[in-house]
Amino acid sequence: MTTGRKVMVLGLDGMEPYTAKRLMDAGKMPNLKKMVENGAARENLELLGSMPTITPAQWTTLACGCNPGVHGITDFWNQDPENLDTIIYGLDSRLCQAEQLWNVTARAGLKTLVWQWPGSSWPPSSDSENLMVVDGTQPASVNYSIANIDIEKYVEASTEITENEFIDHIGSKNLGDAATDCVIDELDLEEESDEDKYAEFDASKTDAKANRAELLLNRYKMKRIKNVDFHKQGGAAMEQLAKVPFDKIKSTISEPTKWAKELPEGAREFITYTAGGQMRRPCLILKNADGIYDTVEVYRSKKDAEPLCTIVGEEMVTDVLDENLDHGKKTMATRSYKVLEIAPDGSKVRMWMSTAFKVDCDDRWSPKSIYKEVIENCGYVPPFTQMGGTTLEFAQKILTPSWEHNAMWQSRAINYLIKEKDLDVVFSHHHFIDHSAHQFWNFALQKPGMAPEEEYQKQIDKTYEVADEYIGSYLHLLDEGWTIILTSDHGEQIHTMPPARLGSAGGASAGIMRELGYTVMKKDENGNDTAEVDFSKTKALAVRTSYIWINTKGRDKYGSRQVRSRRTDHRRSLQIS
């Protein structure tokens, strides 16, 4: 091993010891085995965590060395100090009340990089020239909450489809032929910025279906939320996350017309859309030398001589640079494409288009100059997918491969900065195990109507094999005087039945607490419960994932209860009146 001063904290969110050890012992994680054999670890690779086992709270504990009750990042959302039913975004370093270790190392003269560390890294809490910070305002991936300007899309093209159809991800709004004719050359739309739009989010004032989609897709942009979850069917959070909406495109396959260039014999065409259905992109289906259709080319327009990208077979094509719209203004963005199916006779194509990430996006890189260096030397920040939970094919062909690409890009970027900036300390985090777990782990125990559980079990193993590849990309540092600390924050559970939901990741929970009589909702004119808490009758409210607050007089804005405390046999009991 090493005796040098250089240290890397290699964080893998959601990586749990039992699966890791099982696969290591089976020879499927050789890089992890190399670390264990040449370093130090508990026999079963177990880690010591703190409560609650929530990403931002745990990673802040790792950064500060104290529990959430001390450092103050207590969940994805912190409690609003003024209103019990309101929560404020918790992944904000300004909420952290303890000193992060990276500020200590930077102050000590060590060149330090903090990369996508969720909970307490952004904005930078030190102005030291030795400190570099990249994002960390959400756990998913670098730039995710600010660069994604066009949601991912699932394209079905067929000779049997007679009309082009764009189906919006939120409202299932069918734009039909209007979308086909709406090719945008110049657009001047006045839209409020995300910063203004999501400053306050009151779910009780929005359509229920739209509200669910907004929370799911844009929760990392919201600063303050007032939302009540009733858990009517006791659904599991993992199953909700597995059903992330996406745009769906239906397109007719036909003989190509009005192309400026000469096309190969037998070429066919279809249309896909970008920019929320406001820009169309013509596509060609081409034969190989054997006369089998196996290639799709995507073009900006039929006037172009060269395609935006060429997809052969089922390969994933990344870093596809194209125009898109950001609040109505044209901007350059990058996305990935993958053909899921192409009929040998060219009569059918199924294709995935990833989220589009705008390229001009250095807002959460400090100093900003390192963003340009990274994309010039390591490639554009790669989007990932929110699809893949309930559909095994998506998990196998899209989710795991896109995360593998994202992870290895991150490795290239961090290794580049280590070398070029002569770094001494790195705090890094990657989220692909946790995200994959939320998408499909729960189907590794057979669920009605789902693919065989064994297939999902194989996909879990594949995810950990990608993790091992990612770990291995840093092991060269051991020969260069580095110490690597591999760590995680929590594991994941698999349920045979949906668990009882006492908490809510996105607001207050009125399910069990309402049944027990502790939480009372205001009534509408028909005597039905609304989504607003009646604090004059509410004794206590479950808020966020892990907390119950007593509606206390003298402390809370609408406090209605007196609380008395007494100790008996070293236990404390509360009397609420």
Regions found by a protein language model. Give the residues of each.
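Positions that flank functional sites
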Residues: M51, G119-S121, I433
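Nucleic acid-processing catalytic cores of prokaryotic defense/repair systems
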Residues: G49-P52, A57-A63, H71, D75-Q79
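Short helix C-cap/helix-to-loop transition motifs enriched in small/turn-promoting residues
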Residues: R42, P68-H71
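Short, solvent-exposed loop/edge-beta patches enriched in aromatic
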Residues: G11, N67-G69, A106-K111, K419-L423
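Active-site regions of oxyanion-processing enzymes, predominantly non-cytosolic
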Residues: G4-V7, L113-V114, D360, N406-F440
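A long, amphipathic alpha-helix that forms part
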Residues: T400-K421, V425-V426, N442-I484, I494, ...
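Secreted, luminal/periplasmic, and some membrane-associated catalytic domains
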Residues: T2-R5, L12, Y18-K21, A26-G27, ...
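Active-site-proximal, well-structured secondary-structure segments within enzyme catalytic domains
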Residues: S369-T400, H430-K458
